[in-house]
Amino acid sequence: PRGSPRTEYEAARR
């Protein structure tokens, strides 16, 4: 499944 909101957030922020 998708990563945790933390990981997704950090990956999408940059």
From Swiss-Prot:
User: Which reaction equation describes what this protein catalyses?
Assistant: Endohydrolysis of the N-glycosidic bond at one specific adenosine on the 28S rRNA
Signal peptide per UniProt: none
Query: Example GO biological process term?
Result: negative regulation of translation
**Which UniProt key words apply to this protein?**
Antimicrobial, Fungicide, Glycosidase, Hydrolase, Protein synthesis inhibitor, Toxin
Could you state a single Gene Ontology molecular function term? rRNA N-glycosylase activity
Its top-level enzyme class, in one word, is hydrolase
Q: What is its EC number?
A: 3.2.2.22
Q: What does this protein do?
A: Has antifungal activity against F.oxysporum and M.arachidicola. Inhibits cell-free translation in rabbit reticulocyte lysate system. Has some N-glycosidase activity.
Q: What is this protein called?
A: Ribosome-inactivating protein luffacylin
Q: Organism source for this protein? A: Luffa aegyptiaca (Sponge gourd)
